[in-house]
């Protein structure tokens, strides 16, 4: 278990439970903040700032209610030029869902483009069907308000997330690759 944490955007990583305890990997990637989202989420290392969200990897688990605090935690970390690791147990569903919501908020991406952006860095990313539904609802009903809130709270972002994400998606063949996988 543990294929290493993956960089999604500058200062933003996704990993699994093992990655979150790997001091060498955390130091190498200059991780100062960890967002843990799993059943027994709790701070584990000294000198790291934590946001711990107890949540099951179940389609009935409501992650939407944690989007705002997660977005705030990640964004404040990155605005300071620091790095944040978002992890669950496997780094596939819960953590990916929170990072997708973040990317949707800091760009103009819908949930599918945000998912493709995450998968470009972490190919195993696959939110469960319930989390996918929550992201679809977030896109339809809430993301515009979150974008407005972020701008009011923090002003214009010096981060180049929209450009970074668009460059990731523009990489040769990335969208064709995901379209091919979807057909399998």
Curated annotation (Swiss-Prot):
<dbReference type="GO" id="GO:0005886">
    <property type="term" value="C:plasma membrane"/>
</dbReference>
<feature type="binding site">
    <location>
        <position position="90"/>
    </location>
    <ligand>
        <name>a protein</name>
    </ligand>
</feature>
<keyword id="KW-0904">Protein phosphatase</keyword>
<dbReference type="GO" id="GO:0002376">
    <property type="term" value="P:immune system process"/>
</dbReference>
<dbReference type="GO" id="GO:0050868">
    <property type="term" value="P:negative regulation of T cell activation"/>
</dbReference>
<dbReference type="GO" id="GO:0050860">
    <property type="term" value="P:negative regulation of T cell receptor signaling pathway"/>
</dbReference>
<dbReference type="Pfam" id="PF00782">
    <property type="entry name" value="DSPc"/>
</dbReference>
<dbReference type="GO" id="GO:0005829">
    <property type="term" value="C:cytosol"/>
</dbReference>
<keyword id="KW-0597">Phosphoprotein</keyword>
<feature type="lipid moiety-binding region" description="N-myristoyl glycine">
    <location>
        <position position="2"/>
    </location>
</feature>
<comment type="similarity">
    <text>Belongs to the protein-tyrosine phosphatase family. Non-receptor class dual specificity subfamily.</text>
</comment>
<keyword id="KW-0391">Immunity</keyword>
<dbReference type="GO" id="GO:0046330">
    <property type="term" value="P:positive regulation of JNK cascade"/>
</dbReference>
<protein>
    <recommendedName>
        <fullName>Dual specificity protein phosphatase 22</fullName>
        <ecNumber>3.1.3.16</ecNumber>
        <ecNumber>3.1.3.48</ecNumber>
    </recommendedName>
</protein>
<feature type="binding site">
    <location>
        <position position="89"/>
    </location>
    <ligand>
        <name>a protein</name>
    </ligand>
</feature>
<dbReference type="GO" id="GO:0002710">
    <property type="term" value="P:negative regulation of T cell mediated immunity"/>
</dbReference>
<feature type="modified residue" description="Phosphoserine">
    <location>
        <position position="58"/>
    </location>
</feature>
<dbReference type="InterPro" id="IPR000340">
    <property type="entry name" value="Dual-sp_phosphatase_cat-dom"/>
</dbReference>
<dbReference type="GO" id="GO:0051895">
    <property type="term" value="P:negative regulation of focal adhesion assembly"/>
</dbReference>
<dbReference type="InterPro" id="IPR020422">
    <property type="entry name" value="TYR_PHOSPHATASE_DUAL_dom"/>
</dbReference>
<dbReference type="InterPro" id="IPR029021">
    <property type="entry name" value="Prot-tyrosine_phosphatase-like"/>
</dbReference>
<feature type="binding site">
    <location>
        <position position="94"/>
    </location>
    <ligand>
        <name>a protein</name>
    </ligand>
</feature>
<feature type="binding site">
    <location>
        <position position="92"/>
    </location>
    <ligand>
        <name>a protein</name>
    </ligand>
</feature>
<comment type="subunit">
    <text>Monomer. Interacts with LCK; the interaction is direct. Interacts with UBR2; the interaction is direct.</text>
</comment>
<keyword id="KW-0519">Myristate</keyword>
<dbReference type="GO" id="GO:0031941">
    <property type="term" value="C:filamentous actin"/>
</dbReference>
<dbReference type="GO" id="GO:0008138">
    <property type="term" value="F:protein tyrosine/serine/threonine phosphatase activity"/>
</dbReference>
<dbReference type="GO" id="GO:0004725">
    <property type="term" value="F:protein tyrosine phosphatase activity"/>
</dbReference>
<feature type="active site" description="Phosphocysteine intermediate">
    <location>
        <position position="88"/>
    </location>
</feature>
<dbReference type="GO" id="GO:0035556">
    <property type="term" value="P:intracellular signal transduction"/>
</dbReference>
<dbReference type="GO" id="GO:1990782">
    <property type="term" value="F:protein tyrosine kinase binding"/>
</dbReference>
<dbReference type="GO" id="GO:0005737">
    <property type="term" value="C:cytoplasm"/>
</dbReference>
<dbReference type="GO" id="GO:0030292">
    <property type="term" value="F:protein tyrosine kinase inhibitor activity"/>
</dbReference>
<dbReference type="GO" id="GO:0042127">
    <property type="term" value="P:regulation of cell population proliferation"/>
</dbReference>
<feature type="domain" description="Tyrosine-protein phosphatase">
    <location>
        <begin position="4"/>
        <end position="144"/>
    </location>
</feature>
<keyword id="KW-0963">Cytoplasm</keyword>
<comment type="function">
    <text>Dual specificity phosphatase; can dephosphorylate both phosphotyrosine and phosphoserine or phosphothreonine residues. Activates the JNK signaling pathway. Inhibits T-cell receptor signaling and T-cell mediated immune responses, acting, at least in part, by inducing degradation of E3 ubiquitin ligase UBR2. Dephosphorylates and thereby induces 'Lys-48'-linked ubiquitination of UBR2, leading to proteasomal degradation of UBR2. Dephosphorylates and thereby inactivates tyrosine kinase LCK. Inhibits UBR2-mediated 'Lys-63'-linked ubiquitination of LCK.</text>
</comment>
<dbReference type="GO" id="GO:0007179">
    <property type="term" value="P:transforming growth factor beta receptor signaling pathway"/>
</dbReference>
<keyword id="KW-0378">Hydrolase</keyword>
<feature type="binding site">
    <location>
        <position position="93"/>
    </location>
    <ligand>
        <name>a protein</name>
    </ligand>
</feature>
<dbReference type="GO" id="GO:0000122">
    <property type="term" value="P:negative regulation of transcription by RNA polymerase II"/>
</dbReference>
<dbReference type="GO" id="GO:0061851">
    <property type="term" value="C:leading edge of lamellipodium"/>
</dbReference>
């Amino acid at each position: 278990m543990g294929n290493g944490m993956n960089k999604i955007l500058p200062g933003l990583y996704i990993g699994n439970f093992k990655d979150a305890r790997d001091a060498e990997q955390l130091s190498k990637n200059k991780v100062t903040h960890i967002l843990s989202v799993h059943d027994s989420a709790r701070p584990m290392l000294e000198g790291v700032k934590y946001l711990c969200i107890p949540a099951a990897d179940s389609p009935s688990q409501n992650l939407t209610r944690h989007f705002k605090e997660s977005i705030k935690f990640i964004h404040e970390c990155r605005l300071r030029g620091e790095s944040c690791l978002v992890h669950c147990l496997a780094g596939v569903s819960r953590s990916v869902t929170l990072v997708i919501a973040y990317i949707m908020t800091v760009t103009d991406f819908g949930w599918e483009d945000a998912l493709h952006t995450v998968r470009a860095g972490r190919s195993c990313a696959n939110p469960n069907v319930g989390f996918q539904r929550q992201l679809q609802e977030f896109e339809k009903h809430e993301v515009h308000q979150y974008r407005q809130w972020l701008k009011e709270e923090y002003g214009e972002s010096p981060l180049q997330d929209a450009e970074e994400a668009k460059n990731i998606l523009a990489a040769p063949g990335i969208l064709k690759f995901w379209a091919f996988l979807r057909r399998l």
